[in-house]
């Protein structure tokens, strides 16, 4: 991996040196043949994909310089084309991305030279990381040094932009988001790390999973990939109202290569993957949404709203499936690689940005065991589809409040925070860290009754299928009511006003029940409001328990 950017091809180098400008470089780079990666197990490791497609990611970044008419240090992802709007201060719309000061070589220099400086800086970072891996043998020292290197490229908010949702839904019509925009260097990092896997999941050589939200639309893409051909179906999704089928084997090889990292404790791939996960966590920030009646906080990435969001979200979903593999391996003694291979289908996945559809492909795992980890409180569990798979649909949204459970039920979905235990990466987020902040009244204050209603609906949905999640929901409601932040009556009133929770109440026969009756029916005498034995409590959680809600640190701190 001793790669220099200028050694792409002889024509590319000549074009760069010539006076023709960036257009000639783009033309030369466009002639590069896209490398074809064979669908073999070893050749799809994350590090192999990164090495193979570094040129491709940089080539696409080159192309953006020519397409966008922005300032020298503000390459854009054609936001005017994507969103049909212009941002304040931009000539033709687009995101204002500034190169970090240490990389800024002056406005008088050419776009090409500025880009090459940034790209070479990135290659230097990667080379430094690999040198650490070669020299340091102690795993803790390795990880410490890798984290120190990667900290140099921590994203900094340099600019914000506002964008209306442009939806027809009455509730969301006036919603406006604030987007956090990041330096060019972080675009390159995210493209190099995330785009190859994302691309393979979406539109490459049989990895027919997910849809491109740019360029053609879901129906066109589904038709192009043969989604409705009966002889090539396994698993099921939904595109344009039609059942869309795909092979579970299409994604199995890719997932298997990622799952390998779980058991590659001394490898370069495992350590770089761990550090990369921490980098994602370091760039997790609060997303501010301006609703008609006021503001509310949503947990999101600094990349929220730009072209790379889809890449990063896809990777988070992949890591959810990685956790599923760990669950298979540690708890049930099943090799997750074998589990996902042809002939032993267990789980098929459809990923599009932050939306995911999963199908249980046989009877080995109970589909209900996944309840309580998804944003939609009412899981739409359908009957056997035309391809004989039971499926459920779930929207993994940035506003979800996640339930943390013991490691033996570790299905971790989008926007879970990661922390390290020694050199082991583990998932962590206490729902109290963010949960009640997600539901605001029109006056801009937390609506604890609505939050309790969501928890109650989730508790009803998971009763008997996810005991740790059920206990935690009940404990949360009990604590909020004890603190007199909400009442049972207020919770039930909010439940009646929430479509999904109300649907769940009707299914439980609670539509006319009083608040006390609902509480009694959902209560098991063995389930106390206090902490119960067997619930996995981390030091971070113990720290958070000792603080009041208002004093608890916001996300983005080390907790």
Task: Please annotate each region the language model reported.
Residues 1-559:
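Viral RNA-dependent RNA polymerase
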């Amino acid at each position: 991996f001793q790669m220099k950017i200028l050694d792409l091809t002889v024509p590319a180098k000549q074009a760069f040196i010539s006076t023709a400008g960036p257009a000639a470089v783009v033309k030369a780079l466009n002639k590069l043949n896209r490398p074809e990666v064979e669908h073999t197990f070893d050749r799809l490791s994350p590090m192999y994909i990164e090495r193979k497609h570094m040129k491709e990611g940089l080539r696409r970044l080159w192309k953006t310089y020519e397409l966008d008419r922005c300032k020298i240090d503000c390459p854009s992802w054609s936001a005017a084309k994507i969103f049909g709007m212009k941002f304040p201060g931009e000539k033709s719309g687009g995101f204002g991305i500034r190169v970090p000061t240490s990389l800024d070589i002056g406005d008088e220099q050419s776009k090409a030279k500025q880009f090459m400086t940034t790209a070479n800086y990135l290659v230097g970072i990667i080379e430094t990381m690999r040198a650490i891996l070669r020299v340091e043998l102690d795993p803790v020292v390795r990880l410490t040094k890798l984290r120190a290197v990667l900290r140099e490229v921590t994203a900094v908010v340099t600019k914000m932009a506002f964008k209306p949702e442009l939806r027809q839904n009455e509730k969301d019509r006036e919603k406006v988001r604030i987007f956090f925009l990041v330096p060019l260097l972080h675009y390159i990092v995210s493209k190099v790390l995330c785009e190859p896997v994302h691309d393979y999941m979406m539109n490459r050589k049989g990895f027919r999973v997910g849809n491109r939200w740019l360029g053609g639309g879901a129906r066109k893409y589904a038709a192009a990939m043969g989604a409705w051909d009966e002889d090539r179906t396994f698993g099921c999704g939904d595109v344009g109202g039609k059942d869309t089928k795909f092979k579970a084997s299409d994604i199995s090889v890719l997932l298997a290569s990622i799952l390998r990292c779980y058991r590659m404790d001394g490898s370069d791939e495992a350590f770089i993957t761990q550090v990369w996960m921490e980098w994602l966590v370091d760039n997790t920030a609060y997303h501010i949404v301006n609703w008609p009646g006021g503001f509310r906080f949503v947990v999101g990435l600094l990349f929220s709203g730009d072209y790379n969001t889809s890449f990063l979200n896809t990777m988070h979903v992949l890591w959810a499936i990685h956790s599923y593999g760990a669950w298979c391996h540690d708890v049930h003694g099943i090799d997750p690689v074998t589990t996902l291979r042809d002939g032993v289908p267990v789980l098929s996945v459809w990923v599009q940005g932050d939306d995911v559809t999963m199908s249980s492909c046989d009877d080995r795992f109970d589909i209900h065991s996944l309840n309580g980890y998804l944003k939609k409180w009412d899981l739409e569990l359908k009957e056997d589809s035309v391809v004989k798979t039971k499926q459920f649909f779930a929207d993994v949204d940035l506003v979800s409040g996640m339930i943390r459970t013991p490691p033996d039920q570790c299905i971790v979905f989008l926007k879970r925070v990661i922390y390290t235990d020694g050199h082991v990466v583990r998932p962590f987020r206490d729902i109290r860290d963010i949960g009640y902040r997600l539901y605001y009244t029109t006056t801009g204050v937390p609506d604890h009754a609505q939050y309790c209603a969501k928890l109650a609906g989730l508790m009803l949905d998971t009763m008997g299928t996810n005991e740790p999640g059920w206990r935690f929901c009940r404990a949360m409601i009990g604590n909020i009511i004890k603190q007199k932040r909400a009442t049972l009556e207020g919770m039930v009133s909010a439940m009646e006003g929430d479509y999904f929770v109300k649907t769940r109440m009707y299914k439980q026969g609670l539509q006319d029940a009083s608040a006390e009756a609902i509480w009694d029916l959902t209560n098991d005498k063995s389930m106390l409001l206090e902490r119960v034995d067997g619930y996995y409590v981390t030091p971070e959680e113990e720290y958070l328990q000792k603080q009041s809600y208002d004093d608890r640190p916001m996300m983005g701190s080390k907790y």
